[in-house]
């Protein structure tokens, strides 16, 4: 992809979307690593309320993704993006000015209510030519990864130097920068929006999107990969610490190396494989097979450190690959007048997968051992692979 292929006004909008994504991700992930520790020191706090403060963001994201997507289809993306950013800013200000866990919960809830990721991804897809969409999504994934790593590394340092509440002050300032990009970099509208709508027809069209076979497969895929991710984050770190118990920081280094290698391999794939191959249904089937292979390696070779690292490498290659191409597939198969709504359903499936993976993974690991949880994931991945093959046959 050559950046020269993109029109000047589109370049400005793309930069704006990238900045909004990166700054919001950086701000969000600065809070998560330290909230479980420092949240217990807040007024009226307990373990349950700290858990609520962590989880309420995702719950509100699930609730507001589809309404934001539908509204942006009717009233334009710029207005809805800026409303979401205002909610994010207000949430940060409330959390910063509060001295109790209840203020943090309210602030995190308002942050989550600014659920604009699907709207931004839809706009980004509209700004570039079809053959460049997967590549631009890949670059967005890289910026997401960089923001994530910087946030996780810097947040403990900032808290130790300036205190816990400083994170919300920084988040508030980042939110103001996001609003600047939202107001002055995002175009007013790319399409003529028809704000007059019939409620019954809107409900009918919504259920048509839900029942679309291609979109169902895509939504199932994003649900499952995030389900697997959260399950793995519950059980794999424990196993890594057992294997490398005498080597401090080795698990963290392994994760960093694996993610970097995965990003490079995926970038190579999206840059050199033809778009018609990437856009074909075989990509989901191939990725599903990689998940089956990954869990097969985990189960067959047991506690071997090499097999664990190899399995994780395959897992993250498949995960990042699908995370990169699925939004472009959603845009390809969605109706012109319901692109943001369709993307919102996709994002809701994503957050539901993360939530269910964390909950079910935690319950399973409470009653089952490491290999039994992996076997459960292995069976689910096989069923997914079979359904993707059946879809190809049909």
From Swiss-Prot:
* Keyword terms, alphabetized: Cell membrane, Membrane, Transmembrane, Transmembrane helix, Transport
Source superkingdom: Bacteria
Which Pfam families does the record match to this protein? Answer: MFS_1
Q: What does UniProt give as GO cellular component?
A: plasma membrane
Gene3D superfamilies, from UniProt?
MFS general substrate transporter like domains
Protein name per UniProt? Uncharacterized transporter bbp_411
Provide the topology term for how it sits in the membrane. Answer: Multi-pass membrane protein
Which species does the entry assign this protein to?
Buchnera aphidicola subsp. Baizongia pistaciae (strain Bp)
Q: What GO MF terms are annotated?
A: transmembrane transporter activity
Where does the UniProt annotation locate this protein? Cell membrane
Q: What is its main location?
A: membrane
Q: Which residues cross the membrane?
A: 13-35, 50-72, 79-97, 107-129, 136-158, 168-190, 218-240, 250-272, 277-299, 309-331, 344-366, 371-393
Per its UniProt record, what InterPro entries does this chain match? MFS, MFS_dom, MFS_trans_sf, MFS_Transporters
- Record family assignment: Belongs to the major facilitator superfamily.
